[in-house]
């Protein structure tokens, strides 16, 4: 089941990124607020608006400064309602260093919004894991940021995020986005 979910997510990622409205690459410096572990997280995101809905995929790889790696894939679908995007989806986490039986799947729900402020675009959101297995780590992530266009299709961004519940982290990031 997990391999089927991962394969479905990767197929969706390939199809979405090929026909995407945007692709982005972000890098965050992350600090665990419990054990002080530091990592660098890289995100590839792609999204498509169609038929009044939006579909997004996120692939995240975190490399820890003292060794170790985490990978996850999330696929979400959402709808804008009064300027707020409500979304839900599914994720797959490969576990620390791909440890045998360390991987798990989860659902997720969230809200995000953004607004232009002069030449900039501000954004914020919140998402939380909906675990169907109580042994899996709980996590709620909040984020906010600002994006600045460089050209009509290219923008750079800076963001802050905070994770709460079982996973407690703070992150500062920068990104590059190309819109089509």
Segments from the language model and where they lie:
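Outer-membrane beta-barrel proteins
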Residues: 2-180
